[in-house]
A protein has these predicted regions:
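Short acidic/histidine-rich motifs immediately flanking catalytic phosphotransfer sites
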Residues: 48-53
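Short alpha-helical segment
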Residues: 40-42, 71
Length: 78
């Protein structure tokens, strides 16, 4: 299977570790190229790394709007 690049956006360290572990074990073709724990860090990593897939915590930072706004911006601009 073809390899693909992933950025994981998660602000809870345990959740991030678990997500990375699942990807590593269940989808070995996925390369986690970056992680981010904030919106600002996500956009920085996104611009630098150009992922094929983003796994996004919709409740980032305890807010229900930050993750949704990131999704909207990604859809509209990319």
């Amino acid at each position: 299977m073809e390899r693909f690049k992933v950025i994981i956006v998660e602000d809870v360290p345990l959740e991030l570790k678990g997500t990375e572990g699942i990807l590593h074990n269940e989808m070995p073709e996925a390369d986690v190229i970056a992680t981010a724990d904030s919106e600002e860090e996500f956009w920085k990593q996104f611009r630098q790394n150009k992922p094929d897939l983003v796994l996004l915590d919709l409740g980032l930072g305890g807010s229900t709007t930050v993750g949704v706004e990131i999704c909207r911006k990604l859809k509209n601009e990319h």
